[in-house]
């Protein structure tokens, strides 16, 4: 019998363990929870930088998540780096089946190498498909600025508060902006 809360984490596999599912599982354990994981991508990285990311096939992501969710009742779902637009879509479909499970979205936007147009497409998909289902969105000011570029042009009148208000209007219950603004 499982007595500690189960938390399902979607994220990349980081060989250093600084981000991704390895870090999530360690954090969950430190707080008395048991972590379940679905790998969305594989990193090539060291302690100084992330060199590359290889997305896991979205069918694998979906199948692994469904197997876990059909077997165990989770107390929360945490989503980290996603790896591809297809993974965003697959995960959005899965979590839509669990609207009463709190969803924490911490997409590690600034931790991964930029992927050109794919990067913009991933951010747009996150905004359109995941943020409306999110209980708590966690972003740094730099990540918030990058995400905001998917819905607005750079404007000196735009503020962090305006961007947060926009995300809440999309349906996100809470937005936590960590650290200090870049300005």
What does each of the following model-derived ranges do?
Residues 57-60, 111-131:
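Conserved phosphate-binding/catalytic loop of the ribokinase/pfkB sugar-kinase fold
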Residues 11-18:
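Short, glycine-rich nucleotide/cofactor-binding loops
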Residues 86, 111-116, 145-147, 183:
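Short, well-ordered, mixed-charge alpha-helical segments that flank or form enzyme active sites
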Residues 13, 79-80, 115, 178:
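Glycine- and other small-residue-rich loops at beta-strand/loop junctions that grip anionic moieties
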Residues 49-55, 115-120, 150-154:
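Short glycine-enriched, charge-decorated loop/helix-capping segments at active-site entrances
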Residues 2-9, 23-112:
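Conserved N-terminal subdomain of the carbohydrate kinase-like
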Residues 120-183:
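Conserved phosphate/ATP/ADP-binding segment of small-molecule kinases
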